[in-house]
Amino acid sequence: MEYKVNNISYKYTTDGPQVLKNVSFSIEQGKVTAIVGPSGCGKSTLVQIFSQVIPKLIGNGELEGSFDVPEGTFVSVVSQNPENQLFGYGVEDAIAFGLENIGMPQAEIVERMEYVLDLLKLQYLRKRSVDNLSGGQRQSVCIASVLAMKPDILIMDEPVSSLDPNGKKMVQDILGELRESGNTTVIVDNNLVWSAGIVDHVVGILDGEVVFDGSRDEFFQNFELQEKLGVILPQEVEIYRALYAKVPDVKMFYNMDQARAELAGRTTAKTRAEKEAAAESFNPVIRVKDLVKQFSDGFIGLKQVNAQVPEGKIVAILGQNGSGKTTFVKHLNGLYKPTSGEVDYRGESILGKSVAQISKNIILVFQHPEHMLFEETVEKELTFCARMQGVDFTEENITEILTRYHLENEKENFPLNLSMGQKHMLTILSVLLSSADVILLDEPTLGMDGFLIGDLEKMVLELKKAGKTIIMISHEIPFVFRLADYTVILNHGEKVFEGTKEELVEREDIFDKINIEFPPVVRLSKELGLDEIVFDVDDFIAKVTES
């Protein structure tokens, strides 16, 4: 059986632009369909139509066409932002909310709750307050609350953007099991890194129109379209694309096993010189001493953490969901006050200062852009930090930033009407005009397509060149290893590693401990016996094709 998307067109206002234009495709029952496309292409609008938010809750637009499913078909959506979907004080309340609203008997609610808590390995969170969970933990609870409903069609709008690699793998495995059981899943996500192994069917949308409708393998071999859509691909596919340009007879691969098999005969193992890590001396711009944080529900988020941040470097804070990463960075700009311990900026304690005072030197960009966007226009949002701090700027500054980051046509628009990726980029841009020399980025790639991530990478490197210190939390491990100079790794609130990424790749025990894998280029550098460990695809291809 197939569910039909029939000639859907949509405008949010009668005189507004056409967001979707004659969109038609089929969703096969029991398969996993991925809908991809750049930020602002209409993907999330399509989700709202599938779930009937449009037109039942948002009814002032113009909708033509239909999503045809048999009567009684139950469609559930995992929202792009879990905070819009979690109701109730505790984790159990959030999971039970939907079940209670359809009048399910208490005994069955308990049974389904136990099932999803076990399925997603969330039993340890069941008595926790939702407010005190990490972003990734909230996203897991959101997924659990929807899976408990046992929908006929499961629609997931960027469902794993805040999850650590282990959490993404778990969701991938669960969706694979659901597919084997005949369940239908639609993944709306421009990041195919986590879902490549389970996706059957890909629909590509560009400027509100369907530009691709075919199999996963057909899509992975269409390099030109991947570029146009700004899709984020598994690093193995990036390696294949780059290698194919030099070695056209290479066979298609999109996972580590396939890459390993295809590349093994094409490289000659060399002796890699063991480099002694030279102890690099630096003046820390931030020093953290014996930091402890205990929350009101008794949970201890940080346990005697000692760390230092080198000035003018890109520093990555890594760890699983709930390891204390966001808790840690919120102490650096004063949003959290420690239960005990000390935070120094340039040798001076920040604990007696207000967030406003600290933000003149250390500024945080939140994980969820809705927490930072409250001005009436994109232009006002962009200049908010500068205006609050009394930093001078010109109209030319504004125009240059908006044009460079493709927001010039949004200047007078309401920020919350932007796509998720654009909203996140705007929050990052808003700190560029501030006086701060330390910028904290919590999951900066959340909701971004490949184009925006490319812009973000260039921005971060330019900020470093200008002498700024960048501290970022990210679960996008290849992204981290391309950019980071220095890493701090947390596990269950404790620091388990601090040092350069070159030192980190020699410590496989650390990544084993936090259950995260090195990027494919690092793993293949080691497994293929390259004479040097590399951190990006171009350097890797240069190594494996050198004569």
Where are these regions (language model features)?
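The feature captures the beta-strand-to-loop junction immediately N-terminal to the Walker
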Residues: 36-38, 318-320
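Helix-to-loop junction immediately C-terminal to a conserved catalytic motif
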Residues: 51, 333
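Conserved ABC transporter NBD signature motif
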Residues: 59-73, 341-349, 358
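Conserved ABC ATPase "signature" region
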Residues: 107-125, 393-410
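Conserved ABC ATPase signature
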Residues: 129-133, 137, 414-418
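Catalytic Walker B motif of ABC-type/P-loop ATPase nucleotide-binding domains
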Residues: 154-157, 439-442
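Conserved ABC ATPase "signature" C-loop
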Residues: 207-208, 492-493
